[in-house]
Each structure stands twice: as C-alpha cells, then as structure tokens.
C-alpha cells in the first residue's frame, strides 16, 4: 500500500512510500476490452496500459477521427524509460512524457518535440480541444465537446455557447440572438455581457465563471442580499453556502474572514494561542517570549514571569511546559498526544478513529500522528492525503463518467485539474434509458419505455447492442454489475423487487421483496458480498442485503424522504446517497452508523450519484447538469456537463473494480452463483424462474416443463423456450424443405403440422428427430388456418382457394370434407373446441366477415356467433382451453378481441395495434405478431401486464434474437405453441371409435364417423365407408337410393331424409329487364328474341347476338355447356344440381339423378352438375361437393427433365447452375462447380460485370439506369426504385415500407412521406344503410349507437330494457312505439330499429334508403360495383353473373373459368421465353434464342405456334410450341413488339419504331399497314383477331423531354384509323385486348395506372377510359400486360415479381415470383384468350401474298401494295430467310440437322459464286462480240440475310469478284425491307440467317432492270449507306479527271455512281457522279 506518516512537528514530518502490492496494469483504459492481472502478478513496464492492441474507446462509431485520437493518446508506444519511471508524477504545470520525463506544460503542442520521444506533440487536437473534432466551452477549463454535440438544440456547455451561431432551427433565430433573449431560471445567474446563465451557487465564489467576470462583481453585490441563512457572508462580500466551511482551516472567503476567531483551530492543546481580540493565532513559542505579537499585547502579561515557572513545574511523561499569559506555567502534550485521563502521562491520539475525513482512503494511526494509505490501483498524491487512481507501468489513466438522458448515453473523460474534460455521445436514439453501468468490456443500461422495458448490453462504443431480457421486467430503474461474477443486479420499481440475472440474461432470479416498495438506485460490493439500494416508497430507506438476497434490512429509515442515487465508497467503507426532497448528499457506514450530511442547500433535485477518488458526482434535474464536489466537505462544487434531463451517473475506472478471489470461483452451481457475505459462506447457488434447488443446493430442477413458442420464417422454423423472467433466445432452429405458411402443434407426439401454400402440401415435422413426412399433397389450395383436435387425433384446415374446411385423421390418414362454402364466403380462420364438439370458423364475405360455430363433423347447423364489428382482412383464432376463451386478431381493425366460447360475448383485449396477425397461447401468456414486421409481442392473457416484444431478425436492432440475414421477412409470420399432453380419454382413441375411416368427436364422450369424398356409408350404423359405385343417394338412416327418389314427394328413406330441404327458394321477380326467352345484348341496353340468336343477322347494336356462335345449340337456344331452363333461361351446367335455384323456376335443381347426361367433354359431379372435363383433377374444387378432386387424381410431380427447388417448384434443368437465382431460394445454384472458362474473367474498375454472364463487361453507368442491359437484368437489382405490391414506396424513391404502415400515425419513411395525404388515402367509407340518429360531434361507427357522452354501444343493445349507456340514453319512451305510426302502419319499408329518438330505418341487402329515409331503392350492383368477372345481370335486391361462351361460372358465382383449363404464363427474359405453370408450379424454358435479345413475342394457341422477334437480327420467327422447332423466319428492319391475329395466323410487327407491318408466314412476306412520322413513334400494339381490330400506342416527344401518348385503332388492313385516346404528359408502355368484352387495357407508366376503354360498337367507341388500378406498386415500371379470365398479368422492369390483379370486385393483386428482373413481355397461354370463328374470309380468298381481314371481308397485299385477288406477287418480294441455330432446341437431332443444312448451303453458295463469275464473263464476252466497247452493268443486290454469320465475308468476296472495293460501317451490314427503307443490324451476332434457297439467292442477286435506254442487260447493285457521297465516290478509286468525263479519267472503264434518294427520281440526280440512269429505288448503281 502507499502510505504517508503525519508526525508532531512539521519540520519532522516524513513521507514514506512503501513498495506497492497492488494490481499492475489490471485493465487498460477502454470501454470494450480490458486485460486483467491478479494483484500478486506484479506490474509490467512493457506497456503502459497492458495490451494496447486490444484497447478501444467508447466513442460514437461515426466519429472515427475522435476514436483514433483517443486511442493513440491512451496506448502510444511501449515504455522506454527506466524502471520505475512510470511511477514518476510530474509537478503541477508540467507535462509527463510517455517515457516518464517531465517538461513544462507550456511546451506541450508548441510545434517542437521537447520530450525525447516527442510525445508532447501527439494528439494535440484532443489535448488542446481544437476543431474540427472538438469544441471548447467558454469557461476556463470547461468541458471539451465532441463536434457532434454542437448545434444539437441542447446547451451542453454551461453557458450555452455550443448552440450559438447555429443554422436556423424551429423556435430559434439565426445566430446568437435567441440566446441573448433567453431568461435564466431561479437557480441561475445571468452574466451581464453575453447574457449566459451560470448556477447561482457559482456567483461570487471567488472564481470567475462569466466571461466578463460579472459573477464576481455584480454577483457579489447580489450575494450580500441573497446569501442564505445557513450560509456565511464573508468580509469581502462573498457568500459561503454552508456554515460548516467556517473555521475549517481553509480560507474559503479569500480574505481569511471565515477562519478568524476560530477557537477550535487555535487551542493550546494544538500548540496554538489565540489573542484576546481573536485576530491573531500564535504558536506557543511566540507566547511569553518577551515580544508582543498580539496587537492587543495579550500574549505578553505579568504572568509570563510569575512563579512557579517551568523550571519548577513538573510535567507528565512526554509533556512540555509553556509559560502562558493567562495562567503562568502549564504542561502541554505534543501534537498528536493528549493527557491521559487516569495516568499522569501523554497518550497518543488516534486521529483516524476520531476523524474519518483525514485520508482519501485508508488511515493508519502512528505515534503522535497518522499516515494515509491507498488501496491497490491508487497512488498517494503529493498532499499526502489524496489517493489517485493509476495503473502501474503507465501514466495516470483517465476515468470515464457515463450519464443517461433517456434518449442518449453520454461519456466524459475526467482529467486532472486545469485540463478540460472531453464529452461525447456513447449511444443515441434510445428511449427512456435510466440506469447505466460499465464493467470495462460492455456497457449496460435499463429501458423503462412502456411496453419496451428491457436491460440492454452493448459494446463500449454502443455498437452491437442486444437486449438481454424483457420478460419479467416492468420498470427496471437501475442496475449494477458484479465485476467478479459478471452477474447483473437491478431494481424494478413496479415489480417491487431486487433481482439478478446472469450476464447473458438467460437465468434470472428475484432476490429481495420484503419491505421493498419502490426501489430505485443500486450499488454492489462484491468483495464483501453486499448490496445497497434506495427505496422512495411508503417507507423510504437505504436498504442492505447480502448479494444472494439474504439478510435484508434497512440501515437508514429516519429523516429520509426521496432517496434517489446511491454510491459506494468501498475504500472508506461508506455509503453515499442523494435525497431529492431534502436537497442533500448524505453518507453513512455500511452498518448504519456515522451518518452525516456532506452537502445541502445547493442541490435542487438530485437524481443519480457516483463517486471516484475524493469527488462526488451527481445529476440534477432542475439544473439539467452533472455536478461535482469534494466527498468530505462538499467544497469545490462545479458543473461538469449540461444536457437534457440527466438521470443515472456512473464512473468507471479499473481501480474501482479490483479483482480478488471470491466464493464463486470454484463453485459448481448449475445456473446462478451469487456472492454472499463471508460469514454466511461467501456464495450461494440460485435457480431461475420455473426451477428450484435440488437437495445438494447446487443443481436446479424443473418444477414444470417450459412451453415453447414456434415461429415460421419462410423455410426456417425457430423454437423459443418461453420464460416468465429472463431472456428469450432461439433454443433451436430448423431449415425445412418447405415454406411455413400456417402451422399447428400436435400435442400428442410433439410434432408440428405445417401448411406450404407454394408446394400445396401439408406435412408433419418432428423437431426431435428432424424428420418430416407429407400428410396431404393433393387437392389443396390456399390453406389459411390449421387446427388440431387432440381428443380425436384429427387435423382440420381451412382452404380459402377451394372454400372448404376439411379434416384428416392422423390415425388412418383419411380425409373428409367438413363444409363447402359455395357462395362468396371463404374460411380464413379456424380453431377447434374438442371437448365441446364444435369449431369456430371465420368466414370472409364480400361485404363483411363473421365468426360462425359449426359441429366438428360438419353435420348440423351453422350458427353466426359474431356478426358485427369485424374487419374485412385477416382474422386469426386461438383457444385457451383452461379458461374456455377464444381470442382473435383483426388486422383490419387493428385489435385483438376475446370471448368465452361457451357464452359468447365479444370484448376487446388490445386495441390500436398495427395489423395483428398470428396468435399463440404459451402457458399464461398470449403471443401475437403484426403483418410485415419481424417482431413478436406478448402479454399475460389477463391483459394485466405490459406488452413485451421479441425482435426476431432486424438489422441494427438490439432486440433481435437471431443474427440479421438480408432476406425478405414474410409478410405474415405464423406462430404455434407447445402445450402439455393431456390425459383425457375419448371414444375416437379406442380403435378409431369403430370407424373405418375417420372418427370425429361430438363432445368428450361421443363420436361420429365420416367418409372420404367418393365414399358412402355401407351399414345402417354409419360406421363403415365403401366407395360409392352404385349408391346415388344415401339416406341418413343408411339406405341407398337412386337420385330419382330424391324429392319426389314420397317417403323412401326410413327417416324421410330423401325429402328434406326440397322447398323452393323464394325468388323476387326481376325488374323490367330481358325475359328468359330473350337474349340480353352485351351492351346491357337491348333485348332480342332468342330465336334471333346466331341466325346470321346482327340484331344487337353491338352484334353480340352473332358472336361466339360456334358452340351454340339452337335446339335448346343455349351453348352446349349450358343448361336450358324451362322458362327459356340459360345457366351454366356447373350450377345445375348444386342446391341453388339459378333458373328462377327451379328447373336446374330438378331431375338431378346421377345419370350420364353431361355433354361430351364434360365431367359429372357427384351432385349431378356438369363441369368442363379439363376441370377434373386440376387441383381446384369446382363441384359443389368436391367430387372433381377425388383420390384417384394423380399427384403431379416434377418431370424427369426438371429439378425440384427447396421451395417445391419444378425448374428446368437448363436453368440450374446458370449463375442466377431462378428458384427464388437459391437452391438451384447450390453445389455448382466453377466454370473454368469464366473463373478468371474480370472487368475493369470502371465497368460493371454481369453475374449471369461473366464475359459481359458494361460501363458502370448501366447500373441502376432504369433499363436492363445484362441478360437477367441484374444491373437493375436492388436499385430501390421498385417496391413489392405489398409495400409503399417512399417519396424519396430509395425506400420501401410495408403498405400497412401507410398512414398509421408513425413515420416509417425517412422523409415521412408515408404519413402525408392520409385523409385522401383513407377515402370515404361506404355509407351504412342504418343512419345514426345522434347529432353529437362524437361519431360512432355505423353499427354503433352514440350515447352522446363519448360512449358507443352496439345498436342491438338499444331499447332492450337495459341501460347499456352509462347515462341511460339508449333507453327511452319511444322504444315501444318508434317503428309504427299512430295508425299502426310500419314506418320503414324493410327493417326498423327502435331508438329512444325514434325509428332508424334500414334496407335488405341490395337496397338503399331513399331520400325519405324510409323507402328502399334497388341498387344496380352491376353498374355501381362491377361485381362480376364478365357479364352481370341486375335483379331486384341482387345480381347474377354470367360468362362468355368459352367460360363457365365457378362456384363463387362471380368469377369465370375457362373451359380449357391448364393455362400457363409465359414471359420473356432477354434471350429466353419462360413458361410458368401452376399445378404443380413449374418453370421451364419455352424456347431460347442463343445470345440474341427477344424484343417481342405472342402465341396462336389454337395453331400451337409461337412468334418472336429479334430486333438486332432483323428477323421474326415462327416456332412450333410442341416440338420447339423453328418453322419459318421473315426478315424485317428492327422488329420489336408483335401481336398475332389468331384467326388468320397473320403477325403484326412493330418495325423500326415508326411502322407496323403485317406478316404472313404462309405467304412468306410482309407489308406495311401503318406509318407514323417523326417525332412520333409507335410504342406497342395489340390485335383483336376476332373483331379484326389492331390497336397501337403512339408516343410523341415534346419539349423538355415530356411525352404524350395516343391510342389508335384501325382495321387489320390499316384502314379506318381512329384515335381512341389522346393524353398529354403520359407514357403508355403496353396494351392488350379482351376480345370477349371488347375492352382494351393499357398501362401508363407516367401516371402509374392500369386503365381500360371499350371499343364495342355502339354509336361509336366509348372514349372515356376507366381506371382499374392507380398508383399501385403493381405499376412501377410496367413493360408487359396480358389479360385472362378477367385478371390482369403485369411485369415491371426491375422487379422479380409478376403481378396478377383481379379486374372485378375488390381488384386485389397478388404477386407471382418469376425471379428475373428484365421480363419485358408477358402472355397467358390459354386457348380461351383467343375466341375462334367458325370460318373467316381469308380461308376462302385467293391471295398470293398477304390476306388481311378487312371491313368487307379481306384485302390482298403484295409487299406494301394492295392488289386484286388472284394477282401474283413479283419474284423477290418475299421476306423469308433461313435460320440456323437461332433457337435452342432441346432435341439434339434438330441441332445436328441444322448444322448439316448450314454446311450444305455454304457449299451451294460457293458453287453459285463460281457460276456467277463464269456467267458474268460469258456475258461480257458476248457483249464485246456485239461491238460494245463499254461495260454497262447495273447490279441490284438485296441482302435480307443480314444476320448470316459469314455474310460480311461473302459480300466482300462478291465485291472482289466484281472488281469493286468498299468498306462497310463498323461491324454492320444493311438489309432492305419491302417498303424500300433501310436498317442497319449487327453482323456479328450468334443468330445465323441465310438465303432460303440457292435459286432464290441467284434470282435476288441478279435481277434484270430496264435502263433509260431500254437495255435489258442492265443490272443494279444495292449498296450500303447510299447517301454517303464520300464513300460512294471512293468506289471510283480516287481518280480525278478534268476533261469532262465525269472524273473517270481517259481510257478507264470504272463504273459511274448514281445516287437516288428515297423519295426522289434517280433521273433527277443524273450526272451527280456521272451516268444518266433513271430509277426510283433508294440505291446506288454502277454504270460502266
């Protein structure tokens, strides 16, 4: 220990510093990593702070520069000084170098290295507090603030100068004006010059705190007036705040006036003499020395010489005699001694015992004095009293002060005197942080935010924060860390206990509850095994207990009011605390003795408290600052920091947490080891919640098995053990081969039953063995809920897609249909009550949802339990069997409700939630989550406790229980909970209840047997089921009858069940609409007799009576798939015999015997109705009894050539290991080897490398430029501008949030745009039919009654003779008479609700109140609501939906399903067209175009042909969809989008952006039908072949980059063009047609809308478009659009999802994962999309080229010309080219065949070239023989084969043979279309196109033309770039002539060149380069 002796005389005092026996370099000074050393290990001089490589500082991670400065300053280099130099302390005013040397402080940071190691010039910005990283407060030696604290709106400097000259903020004016106008509080003094505020205690304290020193001038004048009574006014005007500072031996006044006349300091026993006038204190040697030293001479009197004198005086041993002026000779003991009471001697005074403020830490008595000693880790300062913390081997270390402000944790380094303290933020963006602690490695804090109560642990810099625990916390106000065991102790103000947790938060235990009321602050003393706390509750006290919770007792309980902060000075063994009401700092010994007040009168509202060395530090709410003073006297009061309201204060230094042996070092506790007082053993073992100690007092045993919570995250299953007190963590996690959409716990075997809606299966997973097996894999739709009946061992599920509830017996694995909902209701929630024998189901209807009760067997009535006040979105159920309670979440209304399921009565459990979703009951706690968030909430099921939260997986979230993984969080996270296995018995448990298939419970003691679909009961006991082969109707009593016995009026069954439910349904007559024997024209405005239907005469104005007549049966006047009613009406056969009267005369429900009466190609349901044959076994229930999805349906698995993804889809093997995530879960890219050809390919730094093809390097600017350049569009991935349809796009464009977070009152977007325009977002809700009678401003929901006092009650409770309103306003005298008038007539036409104010009328469904509020009017739902997918017929009080000829109504009676089932979805992606099918989900490559980009495609389904274009190649291809073989190819300039006229087979192609060409692959030619002029261009086109219409979008580019859009319609021959729509500031990108309803759909990217416009014939096209979708994420960058079965399918560039949106009803959108980012076109491959005609005009026409549908039948075309029928087209006018290897065929034989053709054709070309040369030579010879001397040969060479790989070489060869040399432009050749225009296309692409036949090639190469002179020998050669004169002139060989020969030169036979422009006659240009040749082609001619 370090010690100092105090001896009697100052001259004899000696200072003795003993060898230190303490920890050397026990911890390096940091906040993240400390190195420990045992005290006995000695010190090390190799490093000043231990292992500095591991030293880190608690600096906010954003300020790296600050961190580095501090780190360098602390670590520096290794010590190079002499041994022991580190212990050297420099004098005041000196700087200590790192090598131990000392220099003057003034030389530090003066630009010169004065230290030998130049350490005085390091970290000067930090040391001198220089910008830009630091800001010095104005006070001398004031705080040094981190730059981040400047201008943060908070005065962190005491004078507020850190907030001066800041940018304008709300509430502040620029500059310091706002501060000058500030007013100081009553606790502050305002400086005169800058009007800053300082604490009033600093006024006139002898130290200037104002920059103008006005606090020591004017302040002193004020102090004379305001000096409190408990203070002392000095002679100089200063005010001492405490009288205790008077006569304490210290000159506090500065003029010595506080130390004058102090008897206690000037006593003879202390060797002093006080003059009589009390002005002077003399030493005894100055008394009676013959010289008067007192001014009054009182030190020299006659008694100084009196007798007896000292020579005669006998003194005690050790005493000395002095002559005294008042008494003569007296004996005095030396200083440090006093006269013994009973002995005549001087005895030693024990100063340490009598005065405990002599030494900073330890005090040892010595003979005649004392000496101060310091504990390990401290050195004695030069005052021989103060202990300073050090670490041996280095310089003094900086202690760290932490304080909390609720929102932040701040840090301050405490420095020596006259050095600034550095202040910075440790952790920010917090909420209600109160307590804080630090153990040298981690920082801990408590959060008391409501519903976010937690204890958090983080690194020293605030990073990597993790929540240790939330469970069991209510208000954890403070915490302390036991640095020996790392246990965390904390107080809980609401739970009223002191508790402890292990450092990981997993094991927690309550320690002290007795006499604990409102505990606040906490301090621990591990070496003594003690803890102390403050309690400000009913009995305020300072409490003490052993750290294991034993021996709890108060040590202070009197004269204490509001004790807050507590601190332990373990060196002096004293406890300090602050009392907020008394405004004091007090101290007491650990045993409750020695209580005294340190400081009072100067504290306003102290809260936190800490101690370090001789200083106390506390926070004060009133002054919003951290204060400090001396721990003994309370002097040296100062403010260290200002901030918001400051709570806890904590100081860390390694010396404050000394290491020492302890009882837990060798303990063998299984869970918790707690220190205790040595006298009771030093430690004890403790157990967490739910466990107890075993008899050996070491092990913990479970009292009951903990229940577990299961969480489904995609394919990951998390298992969490729930604890009521402690940390939740993932105990286990499993990766499953399925998606977890719904799950339920099987309490019988502990397995989880999971529904996967992607793979459409239900499987069982056993967590113990990790095994899974499939329970159900066929006939599944979208499973919305699972429920498990533990009594009968049955699994129930709800299927929204198939609208059924089904059951599966886990004993027999048979399934049965419980209930089918054929209307518009679908089950979305489900739970079972096995002991009651029924289940609760949530049914979602069109207009509302309701909760019903159904028997578990499905046999019995369906009771509506909860009808009102339910939302229309997700509703999930969970049951608490212990309390007979059902809970349900309502995501639409944002609340959780509950009810007793035996006595239903709905009550709200929790409201104002953000879309609650899944529920789970774990023990006594209810868990739930919210849509779109990765958080799980829970609270006690009694709803008495706070809401707790578990963050599953969130980036930078301390509450996350598993590491953040950058994957999308599922929108809805399913939950399930384990539950203990019950011992209940049930009949179904014994041999399956005697049932052959399925046993279902009917309560706890009864059961019933069910049969699977297609089975019937065999016996009368209904126990055994057999396959229904001949039993058409099974009586309830067991008999088997034929269907003609059903409802025949006779009793054929014993129980008469054959005649049950046979009454006709009441049906209101319709309004004056079309009669049943009339046909309703599709326009809805005309009726014609059915006799005129399909009579080849157009009677309807819209011609609909003559449409779709191919399958119209004139005998029954209905289509073949329809039933002809007796009244003449037609209904779809799918609605026959389904129990609903669709005909109106019930004729569709008569004669329902199961005889073979369905039309061919139809399937007969078990009920008797007929559906399309393709609907059988298609995975969707279409029969009302579900019989179409029977057990014989083959399970569809992946074909052999496909691979199954982990998510269950089937994937084309060609897409496996292609570098792209095609599965969506990346399972197709697992275990892929490295491609050696690409492994070493890298791009330049300024380039972007495509991941789908590493060989492609693009400029870096392609990244996120809005277009896709890579083959799979990965250059547009993660660009932040495309959000999912379930997300909202923030206005910034860089952020997406969940759509349900829009307008929820919380800003989730960084720019807050999600909370803008929320009133418009909410819109106007549909008005209820019940009008509220209240006029109160407080509005209740429509179905609620306003009590006019802010309360709302259900209308059903009004006028029920019981006052439900608190004020009784729901009952009144009018309740009995309100619904009838005085005459007795009913007031309301339909329904009446009596209220105290009168009648409230309402109407039946389908009606609305008239203006008189009494009568009801029919609603035209067809017009107002558009509820039907296709055709809608309004009826009284309702409507009926119908379908077009190729469709039939589904069981929902709203949507239409194609008779040709099995449609798939095709979409293009760069060079591929992919095919996505649904049952099962399969993705394969329909066809591939090698490396060429596919720019458009379409299908002709009935012909089974596909068509696609390749713009770069200039070719349109026809491909056989069955064989995937190219049939034919046509050459066109720059073809992009195309659309098929499926009637004739013609293809309409957008060519060159300004032309539309019609192409016939039969006629092998194309012709232009539309041409637009610049600056307009055609963007997209669509064809309706049935109605012979073409539609196209024209974009006009206007000024400043703005665009306008036009939609044009024309006949298919290009005639009768009409503009349907024109819109400015628009950019339409795609359109498609619905030929059945004659609707044109289009998307506008600029307006983000999907719209439609009718082109049905009327008086003209309807020109007003209807918006179907607007501002939806389904329309971010739409590039492709298709419509099928009244659903729109959309693809967006940059999105990996296609979108399917219903175009009727609610228009809900769903996503379809396609996993490519660059899909451009999308087409539904369904036959019904293209209705067929029985015949078409072109089938009988005689056109030799093109035959196009036209207004009057057809038109013939040759190229661009209309020609007469029969006229032949000239040779060479076709467009056909041959294709080699253009498309990837899956058949290798085809590839070999193509390669063989290529080599054969190349050989023919070589022969042709040779023949050509020979022929030309022969011609030239004949020509010369006839006497001609010049060569006049014109060659016209057309090149439709521009994409041939060897074309360029071929052309160069031909030019060489012709003697002509010219150069083509870079890598391109030109092709000429039939419209005489040119386009330049790539000649180096992998597409290889070639002349179709050699004769054709020769004919095209040498085509005779007539010259001006009529010379038949003239030939013409078409050249590239004919308009470029320089290049053409180069053909002349560069020769020049001046003799009039046109520049040819004399005697040279070089051809002249003639150029003719596109629109000019060549003759007009004659002589330009020579020659005189007429022509009209845009070409260049060689003229010899």
Curated annotation (Swiss-Prot):
List, as start-end ranges, the regions of compositional bias called Polar residues: 30-48
Q: Where in the cell is it found?
A: Cell membrane; Cytoplasm; Cytoplasm, Cell cortex; Cytoplasmic vesicle, Clathrin-coated vesicle membrane
Record's compositionally biased regions (Gly residues): 1932-1946
Q: What keywords appear on the UniProt entry?
A: Cell membrane, Cytoplasm, Cytoplasmic vesicle, Disulfide bond, EGF-like domain, Endocytosis, Endosome, Glycoprotein, Membrane, Phosphoprotein, Receptor, Repeat, Signal, Transmembrane, Transmembrane helix
- On the tree of life, the source organism's domain of life is Eukaryota
Site location (Critical for endocytosis): 1837, 1878, 1892
Biased composition, Basic and acidic residues: where in the chain? 1-19
Ranges for the region named Disordered are 1-48, 1927-1951, 1965-1984
Glycosylation, residue list:
30, 365, 384, 429, 666, 749, 782, 1022, 1240, 1265, 1326, 1475, 1490
Where do the LDL-receptor class B repeats lie?
441-485, 486-528, 529-572, 573-615, 750-792, 793-836, 884-925, 934-940, 1588-1637, 1638-1687
What residue ranges lie in the Cytoplasmic compartment? 1821-1984
The organs and tissues expressing this protein are described as: Ovary.
Can you list the GO cellular component terms from the UniProt entry?
A: cell cortex; clathrin-coated vesicle membrane; coated vesicle; cytoplasmic vesicle; early endosome membrane; plasma membrane
Mind listing the GO molecular function terms for this protein? calcium ion binding; vitellogenin receptor activity
The membrane-topology field of this record reads: Single-pass membrane protein
**Which parts of the sequence carry Phosphoserine?**
1926
- State the deletion phenotype: Disruption of vitellogenesis resulting in failure of oocytes to take up yolk proteins and form yolk granules. Oocytes complete oogenesis without morphological abnormalities but eggs are shrivelled and do not hatch.
The EGF-like domain sits at 306-343, 348-388, 1418-1453
Give TM segment ranges: 1800-1820
Q: Which GO terms describe its biological process?
A: endocytosis
Recorded hits in CDD domains, A to Z, give: EGF_CA, LDLa
What intrachain disulfides are recorded?
90-102, 97-115, 109-124, 129-144, 137-157, 151-166, 184-197, 191-210, 204-220, 227-239, 234-253, 247-262, 266-281, 275-294, 288-304, 310-321, 315-331, 352-363, 359-372, 374-387, 1025-1040, 1035-1053, 1047-1062, 1074-1087, 1081-1100, 1094-1109, 1118-1130, 1125-1143, 1137-1152, 1158-1170, 1165-1183, 1177-1193, 1198-1210, 1205-1223, 1217-1232, 1243-1257, 1250-1270, 1264-1279, 1283-1296, 1290-1309, 1303-1318, 1340-1352, 1347-1365, 1359-1375, 1422-1432, 1428-1441
Recorded family membership: Belongs to the LDLR family.
The record's subunit annotation is:
Interacts with osk (isoform A).
Q: Sum up the protein's function in the record's words.
A: Cell surface receptor involved in uptake of vitellogenins (yolk proteins) into developing oocytes by receptor-mediated endocytosis. May also mediate uptake of apolpp/apolipophorins and their incorporation into yolk granules. Along with its ligands, required for maintenance of microtubule plus-end orientation towards the posterior pole of oocytes. Involved in polarized localization of germ plasm components, such as osk mRNA and vas protein, to the oocyte posterior cortex.
Protein name, please? Vitellogenin receptor Yl
- Origin organism lineage: Eukaryota, Metazoa, Ecdysozoa, Arthropoda, Hexapoda
Gene name tied to this protein: yl
